[in-house]
Amino acid sequence: MALSEVLSMVAQLGYYEKVTGILGVVSIILLFWKLNHEPFYPALPLAGEPPQRRWFSLSNRLRYYNDCAALFDEAYHTAYAKKGKAVLVPSMGVHTAMIMPESAMNWAMSQPDDSLSIKKAFSELNQTKYSLGHSRYWEDPWQLDLVKAHLSSILQNLIPQLNEELAAAFSKHLGTDAENWKEIELEVIMRRVIAQATSRFIVGLPLCRDDGYLDLSYKVILGMVTTIWATLPFPDLIRAVTGPLASWQTRRNISRIQEHLEPLYQERISILESRDGQKSDPGPQDLFMMMLRFAQKKRPDEYANLGIMTRRVCAANFVAMHQSTVSVTNLILNIIGSDAEFNTIATLRDEITQVMRGTDAKGCWTKDTFTRMRKCDSVAREAMRLNFPLGTRGSMRTVLKDGLESPEGIKLQKGTTISWLASCAQVDADRFDNPQKFDPFRFSRASKDDDDDDDDDGRSTSSHTKDAFVTTSPQYLPFGHGKHACPGRFMVDLMFKIILAQLLTHYDLGWPEDYQGKQPPSVWQGELSEPPPGARILVKRRKV
């Protein structure tokens, strides 16, 4: 075909067809260049490639999507990370990730934030530049810093609120029928339950029970995830197009959330700016009120801008709701799946009943109540061990300035993001017997004699602390590690244990008949292991 004929055909195309064609050609050129360009670190080995190779083959790039678990397992066990060596692995789209050995963890955690930044790493990962309209929500995430600063002081007051909200949510979504089994799609229901419970902490009553607000909150979360998938695989030039397109509906939903928040915002502003509010406790203790108090003093421009405050609430929702929903869905599936072998449900019920006998006459929970729930703690940690909530890699950090040198002598360049193969470390056969098996009471059996680890009141002592759900280490990274470990993990701990108590005390659980008593397997999307789509369970209210 002559060039003139090609040009004639192009001329006949409409405007959108021409734009699409140009973007397609540019994408192919950029992808070809990126896939064949030498990485930042030509001296580092490439996982799955021969030693002399300096770029990833297309087949190895495709392994990231269809065989990522095996590829990363090879990088960890066989060749590099476990043996104290850094390695490069293929990542989403055109990108390459640097995996650090476990031996470098303590060094990395000790670096100042202006050298290695977790905030910059998560800003790049979550792409809020597009979904929320600005990178400030992760690069200056003061709404999350407030949780770290104040959670411990409000925790005791938060416990009965979470208990009340979870009880209401389960009754609403699971029902009270004690005669007939009800089939539910588990993750869908847990989205609603988690959204209601976490919103009690974030925005308080009555908004936490407003179905319109809760539905919009989760639509924004799913929209943020869509934006991540639409931008991360590509170079910045392509992201500038795909990011706004993928975030269009999310921005509309954020505007609708803002309408729900406006009356609450005006009410709280009135409290803070009233004379009484200045002299006494200005009222509610939820996160939104904490945010307004902080912004009034430290971020006055944001304090006066409901749009920005709304987006900070959306960022807090993303952290609190999304991963908790995935994790608790896996937890419940694992409990039902292990019940036949370990009598998991009855064992947990016995512990919950025994622990609750030690509460006051009203059955009020305390911090001490949770520390005594060692089997519940073990089952939650075991579920998190096998179902790493952040994909395969953990404790990401981005290098902010040149000249930083790792313990093994790698001169890290500005803009490089380092991470660790967390999920591989958590199923290391040198650390765990039958590491791929869900053993619900693995950690409550950690000592030879559990009774020796309790004080006279049956409370867990320091010997159990290292295996607790909230305890981080280089071998257990669902909540990160070091000074930036997730502060919200303590609320997650409370919420998961209350969920187990509410669910197992008040409901019988089982598999639908077509599952034939077997747990459906998780699915992989790239390096993400997710609950089986559409997984169903049976529930029935117990006659207690």
Swiss-Prot record:
Residue spans crossing the bilayer: 13-33
Cofactor(s) in the UniProt record: heme
UniProt-listed GO biological process terms: secondary metabolic process
Compartmental location: Membrane
Annotated PROSITE patterns: CYTOCHROME_P450
Entry keyword set: Heme, Iron, Membrane, Metal-binding, Monooxygenase, Oxidoreductase, Transmembrane, Transmembrane helix
EC number: 1.-.-.-
Induction of synthesis: Expression is positively regulated by the cluster-specific transcription factor tenR and is induced during cocultures with the natural competitor fungus Metarhizium robertsii.
Pathway: Secondary metabolite biosynthesis
Positions with a binding annotation for heme: 486
Membrane topology per record: Single-pass membrane protein
Gene3D superfamilies: Cytochrome P450
Family annotation (Pfam families): p450
Similarity comment: family membership: Belongs to the cytochrome P450 family.
Name of the protein: Cytochrome P450 monooxygenase tenB
Species per Swiss-Prot/TrEMBL record: Beauveria bassiana (strain ARSEF 2860)
